[in-house]
């Protein structure tokens, strides 16, 4: 099966909101703690080994990386790799810069159509993960959480983590959050959850095509 994300390439890097590209294509943000396996997940989703780079020193990446997907001449969308957060040894000034960059981007970027939140299945919904959700909540746009590294849990532990996370996310909906909050298990190593993640992201950036696919299946 061909996936849109398999047609991905590096587009640009920015370190300030003023440098965000004046593109019109929909954007999907990828967020997560520095050790949540975000870069690895992006590479597996895009079927590439070195598209997104993980810093050898967690927390050192301070910029936003853009990857275009679809035909090179006419990109369909952009994947936006946000700086990893939560690493204790990062200087305070850098943390403040990240927080301003992340919160402003998530709250004000009109092209942004949804956020993929990467969380280690063994430690989901940390305080900083919740902060990301709360920054994004006012937009009413969807958040889909990937519980990464689920291969490190037993089957029952994975099920328990999934249920507990969904219950916690439901509390945001009950509190009035308008956007969809969904979650799934994901393992880059075992390739668990790849098809589901592909389908969801493509439904965000190409909703008309997704509707056609569902109609074809129904027939």
Swiss-Prot record:
Keywords: Cell cycle, Cell division, GTP-binding, Magnesium, Metal-binding, Nucleotide-binding, Septation. One of its GO terms (cellular component) is cytosol. GTP binds at residues 32-39, 59-63, 81-84, 148-151, 185-188. Its cofactor is Mg(2+). Residues 24-207 form the EngB-type G domain. GO terms for molecular function: GTP binding; metal ion binding. One of its GO terms (biological process) is division septum assembly. Necessary for normal cell division and for the maintenance of normal septation. This is Probable GTP-binding protein EngB. It comes from Burkholderia mallei (strain ATCC 23344). The gene is engB.
